[in-house]
A protein has these predicted regions:
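The beta1-alpha1 cofactor-binding region of Rossmann-like NAD(H)/NADP(H)-dependent oxidoreductases
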Residues: 40-41, 60-72, 104
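SDR active-site lid
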Residues: 174-244
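Conserved glycine-rich cofactor-binding loop
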Residues: 8, 15-17
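Residue(s) in the substrate-gating loop at a strand-loop-helix junction
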Residues: 142
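Active-site helix of classical SDR
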Residues: 122, 158
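Substrate-binding pocket helix/loop in short-chain dehydrogenase/reductase
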Residues: 98-99, 103-109
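A glycine-rich helix->loop->beta "capping" turn
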Residues: 53-56, 76-87, 95
Length: 276
């Protein structure tokens, strides 16, 4: 198992939630941190927490959809720390709405952040990770990268894409003999503001959906999620399921095959009747 002391870790979406918790846990484990977010207020909060721990930190505002800016950022991080060992492509947004009433621009936005943001981060940092001789790509998908549910087609598409991209990358690194490990992360319901901050079509009762998520679905704290993720990274796991719900739902999908679709549609309609 690998440790984190002396490693340089990049964390996107580090201004809140899982990203912030990952940065803090990595700092406590002896890593140096390059953190970024579009939320500068949250980013500053994370930076202060890391400095209080005593970790070397570089904090920058970064929109993961801006490829050119990401390229410059990767070079700046390498120049600042001298190396890069790990990248946690964590930045993401949520969206709710049936395809029939969802506009193209909303689907594109979700794909830009949740999929292309991951691709951008992976591509621009991969040469530095290979050069380090001890690299690791950690891409955050979702339980919605394991199965689909109504009202989440755009998010499902992005998270399924992250899963496929990352699993292919892991095999490519192994076949090429590159010193880069690759892990896909599938969080279940985490106690963050992702649903509260999401966008949605007009027919979605966002307040009710948020209440349902907070009360019935958000079972794991970001801090617990971070510990689970980092334990998976230490063990070089190909896939990390975060939370008891993620483990249970993954098992259901494996056991039922495509039959899960009817089951989940029924459950979703009863749990969130106002969402459609």
């Amino acid at each position: 198992m690998q440790g984190f002391a002396g490693k340089v870790a990049v964390v996107t979406g580090a201004g809140s939630g899982i990203g912030q918790a990952l940065a803090v846990e990595l700092a406590r484990s002896g890593a140096s941190l390059a953190i970024s977010d579009v939320n500068t207020e949250g980013l500053a909060d994370t930076e202060e927490r890391l400095k209080a721990i005593g970790a070397p930190v570089k904090a920058d505002r970064l929109d993961v959809t801006e490829r050119g800016a990401f390229e410059l950022y990767a070079d700046a991080v390498k120049e600042h720390f001298g190396k890069v060992n790990q990248i946690y492509n964590n930045a993401g947004i949520a969206f709710a709405g049936d395809i029939e009433v969802t506009e193209f621009k909303d689907i594109e936005k979700v794909m830009d952040v949740d999929f292309w943001g991951v691709v951008n981060g992976t591509k621009v940092f991969l040469p530095h990770l290979i050069e380090s001789g001890d690299g690791h790509v950690i891409n955050v998908s979702s339980i919605f990268g394991l199965f689909a549910v109504p009202g989440q087609a755009a998010y499902n598409a992005a998270k399924f894409a992250v899963r496929g991209f990352t699993e292919a990358l892991r095999q490519e690194m192994e076949l090429a003999g590159h010193p880069v490990k690759v892990t896909t992360v599938h969080p279940g319901g985490i106690k963050t503001n992702i649903v509260r901050n999401m966008t949605a079509v007009d027919s979605v009762d966002k307040d009710q959906l948020t209440k349902t998520f907070d009360k019935k679905l958000a079972n794991t704290t970001p801090e617990k999620a971070a510990r689970i993720i980092l334990e998976g990274v230490r063990k070089n796991k190909a896939r990390v399921l975060v939370g008891p719900d993620a483990t249970a739902l993954d098992l259901i999908v494996r056991l039922t095959g495509s039959g899960y679709q009817r089951l989940f549609s029924t459950v979703m309609s009863r749990m969130v009747p106002e969402a459609h």
